[in-house]
Amino acid sequence: MEPGLWILLGLTVTAAAGFVPCPQTGGAGRTSVPRAPRVAGSEGDCEDSVASPRRQTVAPTAGKGPSPGSPGRGQAAEGDPGHRRVRRCTCFTYKDKECVYYCHLDIIWINTPE
């Protein structure tokens, strides 16, 4: 491959590695919902999906399948966003190696069976 293509590929991967999109609610009608202006230091913050790195968040039915009386996937198709996994790390970018390292150590520690 030519060096220019390698550089383009490397820049694309590097740029994509630090991007963590915040979930958007409301679908096509989002324009009618007023949003607060972004604060300069708040890049990477998702208020409704950020969890403390020390707090373990597990759904009450995480290990169970759908119960016989529950609608299952049909409920998610009707407009319910379904189960969304919360963000455990509050690192602003993946380029913050120290934050990512300690956050993932904490996740591994929490998920390790005794």
UniProtKB/Swiss-Prot annotation:
A UniProt-annotated Pfam family: Endothelin
GO cellular component: extracellular space
Lineage of the species this protein comes from: Eukaryota, Metazoa, Chordata, Craniata, Vertebrata
Leader sequence residues: 1-17
Residue stretch(es) of the prosequence: 18-86, 110-114
Name used for this protein in its record: Endothelin-3
Annotated region described as Disordered, given as residue ranges: 24-83
UniProt key word Signal: yes
